[in-house]
Amino acid sequence: MFKIGNFTLNSRLLLGTGKFDNEEIQTQAIAAAETEVLTFAVRRMNLYDKDLPNPLAKVDLSKFITFPNTAGAKTAKEAVRIAEIANHAGVCDMIKVEVIGDDETLLPDPLETYEACKVLLEKGYTVCPYISNDVVLAKRLEELGVHAIMPLASPIGTGRGINNPLNLRYIIERVNVPVIVDAGIGSPKDACHAMELGADGILLNTAISSAADPVKMAEAMNKGISAGRLSYEAGRIPVKYTAQASSPTEGIGFL
């Protein structure tokens, strides 16, 4: 169990809702993931026009914490406007601040992200910024007052896993708010690794929705995240450079 602002979460898997082939697979994958939090791009939801398609039409949103994001924003001003659209439509006031600074790599813009977070915090939102694995930026955002830090593992949709585990560990060790690893996770192994490093949770979309069997992958990710967290809490053995027998040698007679 952990908290983001006033929201208490039991599941450490936060699930994105895009890219599923159809609504049936989406619904089954959500169930298999056992998630409590569904995230979505506000621009995809058509919040004010009920005649347009709703990608979550078949999902009972009353059973979940809805977690809108500002995908599509390229400036702080755009991110704030998107967040306010979601809030005025009655969607959860916890917002993932996503401000993209480069169209090719889809890496977040640190300056615009910081400014958007500052404004949204002043307006009373629960703010969770998506950032690169910049340790100093993570600390500055925590000092600003954000409620969680969401560093990428690797660029969005690449499935490359954790490109820089050292920086991710530095972020986890240095901030005192939840760290949700977001973007680049490709397999349950990657998710488990992030959790073993001490992450509080994982936000996933492409790794599940684009898998050959999204429902099975959702289950696998759920178990990988649970295993990684349990391993972190248990404490792994230290890495050594010399062999050490697992059987004791004391008290063994000569043969």
UniProtKB/Swiss-Prot annotation:
Which residues does the record give as 1-deoxy-D-xylulose 5-phosphate binding sites? G157, A183, G184, N205, T206
What keywords were assigned to this record? Answer: Cytoplasm, Plasmid, Schiff base, Thiamine biosynthesis, Transferase
Q: Name one GO molecular function term.
A: thiazole synthase activity
Cystine bridges: which residues? Answer: none
Positions annotated as active site in the UniProt record: K96
Question: At the top level of its lineage, which domain of life is listed?
Answer: Bacteria
Q: Any idea of its EC number?
A: 2.8.1.10
Q: Does the keyword tRNA processing apply?
A: no
Its taxonomic path starts at: Bacteria, Bacillati, Bacillota, Bacilli, Bacillales
Q: What's its job?
A: Catalyzes the rearrangement of 1-deoxy-D-xylulose 5-phosphate (DXP) to produce the thiazole phosphate moiety of thiamine. Sulfur is provided by the thiocarboxylate moiety of the carrier protein ThiS. In vitro, sulfur can be provided by H(2)S.
Similarity comment: family membership:
Belongs to the ThiG family.
Compartments in which it is found:
Cytoplasm
Keyword Transferase among UniProt keywords: yes
Note the subunit structure.
Homotetramer. Forms heterodimers with either ThiH or ThiS.
Against SUPFAM superfamilies, the record matches this protein to: ThiG-like
The pathway it acts in is:
Cofactor biosynthesis; thiamine diphosphate biosynthesis
Gene encoding this polypeptide?
thiG
**Recorded catalytic activity of this chain's protein:** [ThiS sulfur-carrier protein]-C-terminal-Gly-aminoethanethioate + 2-iminoacetate + 1-deoxy-D-xylulose 5-phosphate = [ThiS sulfur-carrier protein]-C-terminal Gly-Gly + 2-[(2R,5Z)-2-carboxy-4-methylthiazol-5(2H)-ylidene]ethyl phosphate + 2 H2O + H(+)
Q: Which GO terms describe its biological process?
A: thiamine diphosphate biosynthetic process
InterPro entries, alphabetized? Aldolase_TIM (IPR013785), Thiazole_synthase_ThiG (IPR033983), ThiG (IPR008867)
Q: Name one GO cellular component term.
A: cytoplasm
Gene3D superfamilies (UniProt xref): Aldolase class I
Annotated protein name in UniProt = Thiazole synthase
